[in-house]
A protein has these predicted regions:
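Short, highly charged, low-complexity non-transmembrane loops/tails of multi-pass membrane proteins
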Residues: 140-165
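Short, amphipathic, aromatic/basic-enriched membrane-interface segments that mark the entry/exit
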Residues: 36-46, 88-100
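Alpha-helical transmembrane segments and their membrane-interface exit regions
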Residues: 75-86, 127-140
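Membrane-helix interface and helix-disruption motif detector
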Residues: 1-10, 57-75, 91-96, 113-127
Length: 165
């Protein structure tokens, strides 16, 4: 059981990285549909946050089962703060908008990864950093709000995809 959990902990960053490289700036039907729904509906953004939270809860549980320490408690508190949709929206939005903040978050995640007992905090920071890339920016949401002037939905979709990342 513990070996399986450690295998999950080991493979998790690579799975997230593979998903990132498979979906980032790809011009296929799935990506266009994802960008459209994330921009147009608030419920899609909530579902995205729930999926991120579910993966973080799984990783916190895995870290607790293998090495219970204070860093796991800190990671669980950080994950618990994201249960508020306003907080999660604000965090993902700030990470997406401010590239310097995003870079610092990923650098801190790498530092936490190099320290053995801080692995659980690495998972939280790394997941938030990657998830923020796929979260719509304020500019894209403004384009959606100004969509009254655009009569063609395909033109609106092209503008959204152009400014999404």
């Amino acid at each position: 059981m513990i070996q399986t959990i450690q295998l999950i902990k080991l493979c998790y960053p690579f799975i997230i990285l593979a998903v990132f490289f498979c979906l980032y700036k790809k011009d296929n039907r799935i990506t266009r549909k994802f960008c459209w729904r994330m921009t147009m509906t608030h419920s899609a953004r909530k579902l995205f946050v729930i999926a991120v939270l579910a993966s973080l809860i799984l990783m916190n549980w895995c870290c607790y089962m293998t090495d219970p320490n204070w860093a796991v408690l800190l990671a669980a508190i950080m994950t618990g703060c994201l249960f508020s949709n306003k907080v999660a929206d604000r965090v993902l939005n700030r990470l997406h908008e401010r590239k310097r903040f995003w870079t610092l978050t990923l650098m801190l995640a790498l530092i936490c990864y190099s320290i053995p007992y801080m692995n659980s905090i690495f998972h939280v920071l790394y997941t938030l950093g990657v998830a923020s890339v796929f979260y719509p920016s304020e500019r894209v949401l403004r384009i959606k709000d100004e969509a009254n002037g655009i009569s063609n939905p395909k033109e609106l979709l092209q503008r959204i995809i152009h400014y999404y990342y």
